[in-house]
Amino acid sequence: MSVLQTIDLKKYYGTKPNITRALDGVNFSVEDGEFVAVVGTSGSGKSTLLHMMGGLDPPTSGNVIVRDKELSKMNDEQLTIFRRRNIGFIFQNYNLVPILNVYENIVLPVELDGDTVDKKFLNEIVHLLGLEDKLKNMPNNLSGGQQQRVAIARALITKPAIVLADEPTGNLDSKTSAEVLGLIKRTSAEFRQTVVMITHNNDIARLADRIIRIEDGKIVE
């Protein structure tokens, strides 16, 4: 079953005759539990695609469908709520809230929704990511790799339809990158979590179940 679909997705900037086609008719789908890597060089359109898939930026035309819901048909409030409940994000720069400790950062999406934290699931995530002894730490007391582990936990805590990871190891050294990528792969398998990862690195992309290549705003492979 498809968790995410993009249908003739286009994102244009500027006006004729100086139009930049950041995305130019992108069509693909991601199945439940699949780990997909979208690979492209700088300027290929891969980050624009992630922003469209995550409902962070509207397309010029076309559709993004997540769990059978068309993002373009939602107003801002509906989209914010839907995104919080159904889409987890892992960014290159972690995006942790500096005044919250590790535990508070992880459970923030659940508490923003007024829901009760699933403690059993939380403990499973924390154990898998090796964060048991870090829950009371503040982000500035963590290494880059540890901060990214917290970001992974936060992305998983709502059991989202899909996790979108944008160059998740871009700020990490090679050893820490390998550890973090291994954890993303493992959490995808362990929790049957659908993941789409954006990267420019072919070696990183090979960890995925499937690779999609994007060039000049179009899928080429």
Region spans (language model):
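ABC family nucleotide-binding domain
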Residues: 3-207, 211-214
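Generic C-terminal helix-cap and adjacent flexible tail
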Residues: 220-221
